[in-house]
Amino acid sequence: RCGVFAKTDIQPMLNQGIAIEDVAISSCHAVAQQTIGGLAQGMEIKPPVIFEGGPLTFNPTLVRVFKERLGISEEQTIVPERSEVLVAWGAALSLGSMFNDKPCDYREEGSLEALRHFNEKRQAEHRENGNPFFKDANEREEFLKRHPMAPAFYPQPTSGSELNVYLGIDAGSTTTKLVLMSEDEQILDGFYASNDGEPLAVLKRALVELADRYEEFGCKLNILGVGTTGYGEQLIAKAVHADYHTVETVAHANAAQHLCPDVSFILDIGGQDMKAISVQDGIVTGIILNEACSSGCGSFIETYARSLGIPMEKIAELAFNAKNPSKLGSRCTVFMNSSIITEQRDGKQPEDIIAGICRSIIENVFTKVIRIRNLDTLGKKVVVQGGTFKNNAVLRAFEQHTGLTPIRPERPGEMGAIGIALLTKRFMEGKRAENPDYKTSFIGLDAARNFSWDNKPGQICQYCTNHCSRTIVTFSDGTSYVTGNRCERGEVTADPNDPETKKLVAEINRKMLAVPDMIK
């Protein structure tokens, strides 16, 4: 499949607790399968086979997978030394054979001098440039004043105090966010970090850091309720025994309406997805998501910046300093990679390309996702949020593309966590109104210190003919989370011979048979 689609598949798998090792080897098999199918197109690949190029040089597992799929032995495999530069070596060798009858125009000093001015000349000849983000320093200063960001650190609580709070957890596609919300709906503390493919490990670190920090402050935390949302909503809810959980669209809409009660349009751009939510008179009237492809989302610009060694916090500053921003349009990410390579070849500087990518994200939203031609339909109060809008260059690109001045929260990346904290607060207040003794089911911050889990992939379900291959994540308190099952029976992990288990499966079967068959 397309690499962007594959990445969109991988993120939920990691957030559901599937082992990184399983995802990694599956990725190698996917690359080998696509390469063999695309290049051979049904023709037999006969040994010996030579493997060259960077990925096959530095990833011996990928070579092993290719050998398995091609059915060739070690003796039929050739992996040259320094195979990543084999083509360049061939180019050097060709000078003595293919081009030995042609004059050599290379002159060390003159050629190097020409190379110094090559970028400017090539850039002027080949590419159309976009406009800078600002006309002058004053316009830039006004923009920054218009859209302030909250400080990175939260205020320290009073020593000896006691806080009643609600904990909101947004286990997103690429990042994990936590917020502590007071009873009067003020954000007291938070956590924001990359998942790194280990959402449970990051969650444990976040909870332990919170516990340590408030212990150091001499402040007691009374957590009145916990809610989860995001890609890892179900997994995290099971892990921490959350009181409430819901889909991220609902959480984001609630957070935006809390910030701006008369909001007319909400745009959330995360690491792997986009959400466009239309609101009229406080009621959600339409929701549009990017269908399957994550092209143009936050992880694309992050991946490109990382490849250039650019820290995330420096992206906007670099983009704002671009003198000749690239025009990359709203193409598919895979094709855009080709455009970026062309831009680099034509002499564009990293800041010009970064600026072009920031603009392409917004173009992609309006041309490929929400497909709005008349911008008046967005209404007068537009809220933009999500981790991608922490990037001022993306926010400025939105302003320039739409001609609107949107409302960006001071903490745009934490809006999902804020939304679920608000919803959890309302849920728990409703429960306590019915029963004043109602308590949270949260495991507690102290239990988080000893929190552990065990992944067991490839667990075959025996309760029907589907024989689903499940991954069972078992937590330290004995509870478990199951993924890979196609029906409720797959969630049963107890001994199949136990009478109670048989009774449970029979009840599930009864409920499933009670559902009308609409096909017959």
Q: Language-model features: where?
A:
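Glycine-rich phosphate-binding/hydrolytic loop that grips phosphoryl groups
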Residues: V79-F118, N254, I301-E302, E410-F442
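Phosphate/ATP-binding catalytic cores across multiple sugar-kinase/actin-like superfamilies
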Residues: V23-P47, L144-P155, E209, R213, ...
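A mobile "lid/hinge" subdomain adjacent to the ATP/sugar-phosphate binding pocket shared
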Residues: R1-E21, A32, A319-D352
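Glycine-rich phosphate-binding loop plus the immediately following alpha-helix
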Residues: R1-C2, K7-M13, E84-V87, L93-S97, ...
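Flexible inter-domain linker/hinge segments
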Residues: M98-G168, G172, M428-K520
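Gly/Thr-rich phosphate-binding beta-strand-loop-beta motif of the actin/hexokinase/Hsp70
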Residues: C2, Y154-L188, V263-I283, I460-C464, ...
